[in-house]
């Protein structure tokens, strides 16, 4: 039995992860309460105006494009993750043991999966936050609300915080769970050697998470630079 079998070691991490998810839920409800483009551009009768409609239309196009992009990207990344997991299994099976090989490859896939989940979650919130940040900066004539950059900053900061806490929460949850499972495995050797093997397998989780984050950052940067071919907006557009 590994020397890392104490549940007390991971309890603080589990608690911090749970608090992160609770705070994310609070932020998400706060974001949903912010006005959209249609909400800020209405006449006295409550009919939506052209500017607000255009903001929501552009936001929907960006969101749909982001979903299609992530779907294609994650399809290729799934092949990459499975191929690299198989490679890691083969390398550690040849040099260590089948138990370590399985532990490293499963930890790698787990880290990659949670990292991809955080990226998808962040993209969905970010695309929705774009239009609400624009709406907050535009103000609302119907309710005599002047446009201020501070309102837009508040929305943007709240939206970005969701992604930040999602990364932290999912990371802590994944590392703690992997640590708890790996510490219960029957590795061969003395306590020091067992501890080293546990950390060796746990490193696979970080490797998987970092791999997805690297490709998401590079590919996402390229995607945002692709020319957006659509008819030019009308002169009355914001």
Language-model features, listed with the residues they occupy:
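Hydrophobic, small-residue-rich transmembrane alpha-helices and their short perimembrane loops
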Residues: 2-238
